[in-house]
């Protein structure tokens, strides 16, 4: 629901009028009732928790190949970066480098602690963490993934290009886009 090219038929809308979807579509002030959860927020932080758990536990594992451990850690960082970018896009003001030091974004949770008291971080801190998570992890990932459940190197470059473009880092966006296109520059012919 982040775009403006959305249309709902009347019967669909009225069947969901009390749901968060119906409320968002009709621009209601409050999307959720007190007993409802924000599924988008909860699911994103659930994935972030899992990524944090992987990042804290994998370095202590003595068995296994170092290359595989590096790949698992890289996938966790990429996923965490993606979900923080997604959360920042949904719940924070549009990124402005001049006000990023004071604009509040989302809580920046980097440890797998379910009981931690969290506060909203400033946009500049969230953006810095997103970019840090995407930095230098591509080489730990395979050029082609073994399955659709694993992240290939091209996807990291593509995400880094998009994130840098979103935050106004145009040179880095171009550099990452060119790296991604080295793997596949063909358009899909529908």
Residue ranges and their predicted role:
Residues 1-7:
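Acidic, glycine-rich segments characteristic of secretory precursors and extracytoplasmic regions
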Residues 178-185:
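TPR/TPR-like (Sel1-like) alpha-helical repeat modules
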Residues 18-91, 121, 138-143:
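Conserved, well-structured interaction surfaces
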Residues 88-95, 145, 166-168:
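Short coil/turn linking the two alpha-helices of tandem helical-hairpin repeats
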């Amino acid at each position: 629901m982040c775009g403006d090219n959305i249309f709902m038929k009347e019967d669909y809308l009225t069947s969901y009028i009390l749901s968060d979807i119906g409320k968002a579509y009709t621009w209601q002030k409050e999307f959720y009732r007190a007993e409802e959860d924000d599924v988008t927020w909860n699911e994103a932080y659930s994935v972030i928790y899992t990524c944090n758990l992987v990042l804290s536990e994998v370095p202590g594992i003595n068995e296994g190949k170092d290359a595989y451990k590096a790949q698992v850690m890289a996938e966790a960082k990429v996923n965490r970066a993606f979900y923080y970018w997604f959360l920042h896009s949904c719940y924070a003001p549009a990124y402005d480098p001049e006000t990023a030091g004071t604009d509040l974004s989302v809580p920046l949770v980097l440890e797998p602690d379910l009981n931690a008291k969290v506060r909203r971080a400033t946009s500049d801190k969230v953006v810095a963490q997103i970019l840090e998570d995407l930095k230098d992890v591509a080489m730990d990932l395979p050029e082609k993934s073994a399955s659709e459940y694993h992240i290939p190197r091209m996807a990291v470059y593509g995400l880094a290009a998009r994130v840098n473009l979103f935050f106004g880092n145009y040179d880095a966006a171009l550099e990452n886009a060119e790296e991604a296109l080295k793997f596949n520059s063909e358009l899909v012919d529908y």
